[in-house]
C-alpha cells in the first residue's frame, strides 16, 4: 500500500485492490478450494484488465497462486508488472498478521496456502523483493519506483 500511495501522488487515476477486500466486495461467494481460488484469481485479473483499459493505474495485491493466471495477465493486461514478494515460512508464522498460522498449528485452519495448499511460485517475475524485515516497507516501495523509473 505504500507503493500505491507513492504512485497515487504521481498518477491520481490509481486504485489499490487487495485480495481479502475483493473477496468481500464480490460477496464472499467462493471458498478456498483449488477451483474456487482459480475463479477468484480470474475475477481479480479481469477487473484489473477492465480498469486498465479505462486508463486507470491498478496496484493489485493478492497471493497469486497460479501460473496460468499470471500468464493470462501477461497476455491480456497492458503494462502488467509482476512483483514477487518472498518471505520465509518462519517469518510468516512469526508475524501471523491474520492469525492464520496459529489456527493452522492448532488444526483449525485446513486450507492454508503454502502449507496444505500448494502455490505455484512465479517463474519470471519482473521484480523479486525479499520481505524479511531487513528493508522497511518504504525502502521496498522505493525499489519498485526505481525499477520502473517512476519519479516522485
What does each of the following model-derived ranges do?
Residues 25, 33-81, 101-104, 111-114:
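Glycine-rich phosphate-binding loop used to anchor ATP phosphates in small-molecule kinases
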Residues 1-46:
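Conserved substrate/cofactor phosphate-moiety recognition/catalytic segment
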Residues 59-61, 76-95, 129:
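Conserved phosphate-donor/acceptor-positioning beta-strand/loop module used by diverse small-molecule
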Residues 10, 76-78, 124:
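Short, structured coil segments at secondary-structure junctions
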Residues 94-152:
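Small-molecule kinase domains that catalyze NTP-dependent phosphoryl transfer to phosphate-bearing small molecules
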Residues 21-23, 64-67, 86-91, 134-135:
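Conserved nucleotide-binding/hydrolysis micro-motifs of P-loop NTPases
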Residues 13-15, 56, 81, 125:
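The start of beta-strands in P-loop NTPase/AAA+ ATPase cores
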Amino acid at each position: 500500500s505504500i507503493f500505491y500511495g507513492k504512485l497515487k501522488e504521481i498518477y491520481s487515476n490509481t486504485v489499490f485492490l487487495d485480495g481479502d477486500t475483493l473477496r468481500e466486495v464480490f460477496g464472499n461467494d467462493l471458498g478456498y478450494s483449488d477451483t474456487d481460488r482459480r475463479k477468484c484469481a480470474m475475477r481479480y485479473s479481469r477487473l484489473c484488465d477492465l480498469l486498465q483499459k479505462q486508463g486507470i493505474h491498478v496496484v493489485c495485491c493478492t497471493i497469486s497462486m497460479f501460473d496460468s493466471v499470471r500468464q493470462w495477465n501477461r497476455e491480456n493486461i497492458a503494462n502488467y508488472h509482476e512483483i514477487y514478494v518472498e518471505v520465509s515460512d518462519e517469518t510468516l508464522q512469526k508475524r501471523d498478521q491474520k492469525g492464520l498460522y496459529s489456527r493452522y498449528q492448532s488444526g483449525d485452519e485446513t486450507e492454508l496456502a503454502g502449507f496444505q495448499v500448494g502455490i505455484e511460485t512465479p517463474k519470471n517475475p519482473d521484480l523479486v523483493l525479499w520481505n524479511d524485515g531487513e528493508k522497511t516497507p518504504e525502502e521496498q516501495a522505493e525499489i519498485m519506483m526505481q525499477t520502473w523509473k517512476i519519479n516522485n
